[in-house]
Design a protein with these regions (language model features):
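Low-complexity, glycine/alanine/valine/leucine- and proline-rich hydrophobic stretches
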Residues: 332-412
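Soluble acyl-CoA-dependent acyltransferase catalytic core bearing the H(X)4D motif
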Residues: 2-29, 41-78, 82-347
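A common structural junction motif
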Residues: 179-187, 404-413
Length: 414
């Protein structure tokens, strides 16, 4: 049972089913790349789509989505397979058409009663995702866990957990677009899938030619096991973005994007809230925390732009080389902040034949990772939704720092 302030509701899940490709597919083994099978990607990535009531109310989203998956898996057949480990824990996918997990569910509440503004649904987001038992969701498990939850009003939520070693958000978008196109009578997807994982593998003679701070082994990754982490969300609309721009010089030398402004703001507020040793290193790129905390926003902005400039094809190859040479080192988590901007993928325009979603994106953050999604606030204003996750003591300080920057607090806490 879940609660929303004084509202109680139940989500009844049916027994899980396996959806397979509707036509025979190649039975083969495909090797993942050195980037794919790194330790830092061995997790399930949650994605959620919230849809209003279907016009006319006669279409069943469960049947529509289940049928579309069976069609799309004919072309994206590796998604219906299973990951296994080869020698040296190398990940491979057995394309055996065992299928993706699919759960039909019903919530005994109207969608509009569950939320005070669309973003307040997040405390209950796990109710709309498949429960993943025992296997941990990576080795020998379905590569997609999908749940469709219908509401009494006719609205529904599509919740997906994606094995991140198999694909990223862009790969999932292509798969879902294929699902939509095939449901609308297309004979093939407009963007046929291409494997080519060798493009993300180490070179025949791997080499390390630069410092990779994101895998820095000299930095302690220890976290206090007693830390009580809190999840929350922030909405950056035009008012918040303008508040950040107002802190820039009158005639800035550089042009800063919305992504730059949001990332610099969150990075600085987060670093101050975590109260690190002023001489420690804080990373979106590399910087001494004391300097970041006391410097103006433009200092963080310039470092964000430097970090973006480093993300070249050559750098990806260098990362693959390092992963092979050093045996898949884990991401450094101490004062490391990873951000992913998926606003350009326009998940909020994704139509399965049931209309466009009210919200679509990655709904939850980890202690080190946040994703930026397009969204609307409860006033219908367009903006960017950002989930965050911090220790409870740091969250209060983070909110205070955020108010100083944009005169706005957190939207919701989980």
């Amino acid at each position: 049972m879940a609660t929303s302030k004084t509202l109680f509701f139940n989500v009844k899940r049916n027994e899980p089913q396996l959806v397979v490709a509707e036509k025979p597919t190649p039975n083969e083994i495909k090797q993942l790349s050195d980037i794919d099978d790194q330790e830092g990607l061995r997790f399930l990535l949650p994605v959620i789509f919230i849809y209003p009531p279907i016009v006319g109310g006669k279409l069943d989203p469960v049947k529509i989505i289940r049928d579309g998956l069976a069609k799309a898996l004919v072309f994206y057949h590796p998604f219906a397979g299973r990951i296994f480990e080869g020698p040296n824990r190398k990940l491979m996918v057995n394309c055996n058409n065992e299928g993706v997990m699919f759960v039909e569910a019903d919530a005994d509440v109207e969608l509009k009663r569950l939320r005070d503004g669309i973003l307040s649904i997040w405390p209950h987001v796990e109710e709309f995702m498949c429960k993943v038992e025992d296997c941990g969701g990576i080795i020998g498990c379905p590569l997609l866990f999908i749940q469709v939850t219908r509401f009494t009003c006719g609205g529904f939520i599509l919740g997906i957990k994606l094995n991140h070693t198999m694909a990223d958000i862009y790969g999932l978008m292509l798969f879902l677009n294929a699902t939509s196109e095939l449901l609308k009578s297309a004979s093939t997807p407009s963007f046929p899938p291409v494997w080519q994982r060798e493009l993300l593998s180490a070179r025949s003679s791997p080499r390390i030619t630069c410092t990779h701070y994101e895998f820095d082994e000299l930095v302690s990754d220890d976290q206090n096991p007693k830390d009580n982490f809190i999840r929350a969300s922030i909405f950056f609309g035009s008012k918040e973005i303008q508040a950040l721009r107002n802190q820039l010089p009158t005639n800035p030398i550089l042009s800063y994007s919305r992504f730059d402004l949001i990332t610099a703001c969150l990075w600085k507020c987060r670093t101050i809230a975590l109260e690190p040793n002023p001489r420690e290193l804080s990373r979106v790129s590399i910087v001494v925390t004391g300097v970041l905390c006391r410097s103006p926003l433009t200092y963080a902005l310039d470092l964000v732009q430097q970090a973006k400039a480093q993300a070249s094809q050559e750098y990806v190859k260098l990362v693959a080389d390092l992963l092979v040479i050093k045996g898949r080192p884990k991401y450094a988590t101490r004062l490391n902040y990873l951000v992913s901007d998926i606003t350009s993928f326009r998940f909020d325009k994704f139509d399965l034949g049931c209309g466009k979603p009210l919200y679509a994106g990655v709904p939850l953050a980890t202690s080190t990772i946040s994703s930026y999604s397009n969204s609307k606030n409860d006033k219908g204003e367009d903006g960017v939704f950002v989930p965050i996750c911090l220790p409870s003591l740091a969250m209060e300080k983070f909110q205070n720092e955020l108010k100083k920057m944009i005169n706005c607090g957190l939207i919701s806490k989980i």
